[in-house]
Design a protein with these regions (language model features):
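Glycine-rich anion/phosphate-binding loop at the beta-strand->alpha-helix junction
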Residues: 1-159
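Catalytic-core signal marking the mid-to-C-terminal active-site face
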Residues: 151-198
């Protein structure tokens, strides 16, 4: 088990990391809020244990969770709940470590590139972009994490560019210039004015 290895090699490592990823309905309660409480308790307990067992070496931890489909007996990456769980994970991690980043998985259950992969990855990415995510991962990955597709990777890179544009929002400009900008195109329209062409 991981704990036995950590103890056996504790003098060789400078720091430890304790992640938790229970599956709701299998290794955690099906009710998400209760599952989060369990996941937090596991991470904090593991971090304290490793801090003591490691002789006071630094310990980081990340709290996570995945939805589980009891019909197919698989962790699923394309459900809306997965995007929500990644968002909640980011909030919890930032509570314990204000410098922590927030990552969103572009997950899908699709087995090949196409409509299902596009909308599942797009929903997760949009949630991440609109809620402050600073990292998108699982580029080119399909079937949760079983298949890599170069074609899907190309589509995901384009999606990331689009989501980055969405995340940046409408550019801020100087309100003092608005009247001049409006006046510039009143007679001929705005297609050929300097501000449009710039």
């Amino acid at each position: 088990c991981e704990f036995t290895l950590a103890i056996a090699y504790r003098y060789q490592w400078d720091e430890y990391s304790v992640p938790t990823y229970p599956a709701a309905g299998v290794s955690a309660p099906i009710h998400f809020r209760a599952a989060w409480v369990l996941s937090i308790a596991e991470a904090l307990g593991g971090a304290v244990t490793m801090r003591i067992a490691g002789g006071g070496k630094p310990v980081s931890f990340s709290i996570g969770m995945f939805p589980f489909d009891l019909r197919t007996l698989t962790i699923v990456g394309g459900m809306p709940e997965c995007a929500w769980m990644y968002w909640a994970r980011g909030q919890i991690d930032c509570f314990y470590n204000p410098q922590a980043g927030y990552s969103m998985m572009l997950g899908t259950q699709a087995k090949r590139p196409g409509l299902q992969a596009g909308y599942e990855k797009g929903v997760a990415g949009a949630v991440g972009a609109l809620t402050g995510c600073d990292d998108l991962h699982y580029i080119g990955v399909l079937s949760f994490d079983d298949i890599f597709s170069p074609e899907q990777m190309a589509a995901d890179i384009e999606l990331c560019h689009l989501l980055d544009h969405l995340r940046r929002g409408i550019p801020r400009d100087d309100p003092q210039e608005w009247v001049a900008v409006i006046r510039e195109g009143l007679e001929k329209g705005y297609m050929q004015v300097d501000t449009t062409l710039d």
